[in-house]
């Protein structure tokens, strides 16, 4: 089972997105409403990915990304942000974010993120050529 942690103070806004992820084969969605809860969760149950809202109850989402890196740099991170692509790139450069999602991600966004995660996890377990 692939575990995806969604970190947001507003589950209702992301309910359709999360439900679409849950409907994919072998996906489990977990929730945290703040950065501290997310950090504790990641340390206890390392997920395949963490999807982080831009504004959390206790810190900006980008700060959570920075705090997750030393805990487990291999976790795929996705940010929900209304920044322009250029401003987002500038703000997140060097943090290894997998993607940016719009403030109200859709079912289509969920399917695309899952497809990318599947491709990336398949690459990470691929055997080297001899």
Feature locations, PLM:
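Alpha-helical interaction/dimerization surfaces of two-component signaling modules
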Residues: 19-23, 41, 91
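Conserved phosphotransfer microenvironments
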Residues: 48-68, 85-87
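Conserved phosphotransfer cores of two-component systems
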Residues: 43-45, 67-74, 95
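Alpha4 helix (beta4-alpha4-beta5 surface) of REC/receiver domains from two-component response regulators
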Residues: 63, 81-105
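C-terminal output helix
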Residues: 87, 105-121
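Two-component signal transduction core modules
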Residues: 50, 77, 100-101
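Acidic, metal-coordinating helix/loop segments flanking the phosphotransfer/catalytic sites
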Residues: 33-49
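Two-component/phosphorelay signaling modules centered on CheY-like receiver
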Residues: 11-30
